[in-house]
């Protein structure tokens, strides 16, 4: 008997006692019976061997591949076919991959419910009391793998059921928003975003305080909304704008927003808006806004109840009576004595309650429903969101092991394994949100592409100190592969010319790719034999502006502004936006066209006309002196 057999003999005897007359054991059940700190393959193999020697048949084979995350970073991906029980607690590599064709097929053996046991069913006092104690491992990866191993795998039918549940939740939300006309104001805001010219000066003033990379965000948002909603909303945009403007005008004048003409127009718009698609992003934003408004109503009503209780009145309209009584000296003294509050404190409470009431009326005007109805509909929307979220969570948790199996293929490529897993999980979440079960594909097949995309994208974005684009990464990998091949063939490092011939690239391209592939060097790298200096001591600090150049640049800006001032206002705006003269960000023809609500061709014509005017020798002569400095 080996040392391991002696050490775990009591554990093995406890397992055999638990089985009784049974002669078979699934690995899912064995995993439940074993203590959490047993993860080493040698111990598991020893236990399995002893059980097999005792005549107990094991359903599946445990291999070291299932227990230890592979550190092998090979580019070649092996095909692995896994059969696992639904409750299989050990991490399985259920990923079968090929560069051209990817197919995931996780087969689920039928599990007998009687074969699934938990630790509470064990009969051995030793196993209960000692062996099955929780082991608080300090390794987060082991803990994570252990936790995701507890999640059930899903059959194809279960995946479809969860996808249907997500659709049902989304339908509940969309039906409430559309059928009740809650999105009229939201569609009005979309129309304004699409067709109105933005406050450009205010926008650039706001963006100057931020990172310049955030400047295109507004245009990207406007472009997305325009592509989705511009054509569907165009036939009704005038009626929509007219109705909402009239409603706000009536409300501001203290009129009734539920009067006959407005109500009739609202019903007509509600019917027209039902046929307009509501995309997932807007569905999420609109429903969140509605739930936030309902929560705000609850907070305001709670605030009012507290104030009314403090002032010992029952209804909001009694606040005016209380306010008038405070102007009468005799009643004021009586009220202060009754409420045990000073006049200023009472007036402050009245003002707060009235402001809360005004905000409640504004929300009622916005959604055109009383507050009680808004709250009840928000609860239905919340149920739909909860239904969607529950189905998403189930689908995500059941496929976390798929993410790990794919992430293992990308180990040792510049990112920690756990980071790869988390990036893959982000891809999995996107796959769940975009999964269309009606197309007939298994979810694992669909999700694989999203997971791999997320992982490879994160490697290209984060693995290097300086980000290298994905297409350049592919060229670097190809260059390295051919370099290794030529070293084997030639017995020496290949020259750039030999690599150029082998790859069919121009010599310049080979040199460019090699320069990009270089790793950055630390500024703290010691320099010299005595290493008394560092690399940063020999690098010019270009952050410090040259006073002469800075002054020249400021004067140049003034000259450009003066010359642009001779152009018509619209041509000035186009030139500034096209060449980034305001914020340093040059806009495309399409982006400028979105701003002015004209075609890109019209913007090109305006730009050409403006540049022809600027080529006037009297204007260009002032700028020629700066060309030499710029060059």
Curated annotation (Swiss-Prot):
SUPFAM superfamilies: Sigma2 domain of RNA polymerase sigma factors (SSF88946), Sigma3 and sigma4 domains of RNA polymerase sigma factors (SSF88659). Residues 589-608 bind DNA. Its main location: cytoplasm. InterPro entries: RNA_pol_sigma-70_dom, RNA_pol_sigma70, RNA_pol_sigma70_r1_2, RNA_pol_sigma70_r2, RNA_pol_sigma70_r3, RNA_pol_sigma70_r4, RNA_pol_sigma_70_r1_1, RNA_pol_sigma_r2. Residues 563-616 are annotated as: Sigma-70 factor domain-4. GO terms for molecular function: DNA binding; sigma factor activity. It comes from the Bacteria. Residues 395-465 are annotated as: Sigma-70 factor domain-2. One of its GO terms (cellular component) is cytoplasm. A motif (Interaction with polymerase core subunit RpoC) lies at residues 419-422. Keywords: Cytoplasm, DNA-binding, Sigma factor, Transcription, Transcription regulation. The keyword Cytoplasm applies. GO terms for biological process: DNA-templated transcription initiation. Sigma factors are initiation factors that promote the attachment of RNA polymerase to specific initiation sites and are then released. This sigma factor is the primary sigma factor during exponential growth. Interacts transiently with the RNA polymerase catalytic core. Belongs to the sigma-70 factor family. RpoD/SigA subfamily. This is RNA polymerase sigma factor RpoD. It comes from Borreliella burgdorferi (strain ATCC 35210 / DSM 4680 / CIP 102532 / B31). The gene is rpoD.
């Amino acid at each position: 008997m080996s040392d391991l057999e002696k050490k775990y003999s009591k554990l093995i005897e406890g397992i055999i006692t638990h089985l009784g007359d049974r002669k078979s054991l699934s690995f899912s059940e064995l995993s439940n019976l074993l203590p959490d700190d047993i993860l080493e393959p040698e111990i598991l193999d020893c236990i399995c061997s002893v059980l097999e020697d005792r005549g107990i048949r094991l359903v599946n084979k445990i291999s070291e591949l299932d227990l230890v995350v592979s550190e092998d970073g090979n580019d070649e991906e092996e095909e692995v076919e896994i059969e696992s029980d639904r409750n299989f607690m050990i991490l399985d590599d259920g990923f079968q991959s090929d560069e051209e064709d990817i197919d995931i097929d996780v087969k689920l053996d039928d599990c007998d419910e009687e074969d699934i046991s938990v630790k509470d069913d064990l009969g051995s006092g030793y196993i209960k009391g000692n062996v099955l104690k929780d082991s608080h491992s300090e390794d987060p990866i082991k803990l994570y793998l252990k936790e995701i191993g507890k999640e059930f795998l899903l059959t194809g039918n279960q995946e479809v059921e969860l996808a249907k549940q997500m659709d049902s939740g989304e339908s509940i939300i969309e039906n409430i928003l559309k059928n009740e006309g809650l999105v009229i104001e939201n569609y009005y805001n979309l129309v304004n975003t699409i067709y109105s010219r933005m406050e450009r000066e205010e926008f650039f003033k706001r963006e100057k305080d931020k990172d310049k990379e955030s400047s295109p965000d507004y245009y990207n948002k406007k472009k997305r909304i325009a592509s989705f909603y511009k054509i569907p909303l165009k036939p009704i945009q005038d009626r929509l704008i007219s109705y909402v403007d009239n409603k706000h005008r009536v409300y501001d004048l203290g009129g009734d927003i539920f009067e006959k003409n407005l109500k009739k127009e609202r019903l007509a718009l509600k019917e027209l808006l039902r046929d307009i698609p509501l995309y997932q992003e807007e569905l999420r934003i609109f429903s969140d806004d509605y739930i936030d408004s309902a929560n705000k109503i609850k907070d305001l009503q709670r605030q009012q109840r507290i104030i009314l209780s403090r002032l010992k009145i029952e209804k909001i309209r009694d606040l005016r009576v209380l306010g008038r009584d405070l102007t009468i000296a005799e009643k004021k003294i009586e009220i202060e004595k009754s409420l045990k509050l000073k006049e200023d404190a009472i007036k402050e409470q009245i003002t707060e309650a009235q402001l809360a009431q005004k905000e409640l009326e504004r929300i009622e005007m916005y959604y055109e429903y009383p507050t009680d109805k808004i709250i009840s509909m928000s609860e239905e929307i919340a149920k739909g969101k909860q239904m969607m979220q529950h189905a998403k969570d189930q689908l995500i948790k059941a496929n976390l092991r798929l993410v790990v199996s794919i992430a293992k293929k990308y180990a040792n490529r510049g990112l920690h394994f756990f980071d790869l897993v988390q990036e893959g999980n982000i891809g999995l979440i996107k796959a769940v949100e975009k999964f269309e079960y009606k197309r007939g594909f298994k979810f694992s097949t669909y999700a694989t592409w999203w997971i791999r995309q997320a992982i490879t994208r994160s490697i290209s974005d984060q693995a290097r100190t300086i980000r290298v684009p994905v297409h350049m990464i592919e060229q670097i990998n190809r260059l390295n592969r051919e370099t290794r091949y030529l070293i084997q063939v030639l017995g020496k490092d290949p020259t750039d010319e030999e690599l150029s011939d082998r790859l069919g690239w121009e010599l310049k391209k080979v040199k460019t790719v090699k320069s990009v592939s270089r790793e950055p060097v630390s500024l703290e790298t010691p320099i010299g034999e005595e290493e008394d200096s560092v690399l940063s001591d020999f690098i010019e600090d270009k952050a410090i502006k040259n006073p002469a150049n800075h002054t020249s640049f400021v004067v140049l800006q003034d000259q450009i502004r003066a010359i642009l001032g001779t152009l018509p206002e619209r041509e000035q705006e186009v030139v500034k936006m096209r060449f980034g003269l305001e914020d340093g960000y040059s806009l495309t023809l399409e982006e400028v066209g979105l701003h002015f609500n004209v075609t890109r061709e019209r913007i090109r014509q305006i730009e050409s006309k403006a540049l022809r005017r600027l080529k006037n020798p009297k204007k260009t002569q002032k700028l020629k002196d700066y060309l030499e400095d710029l060059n």
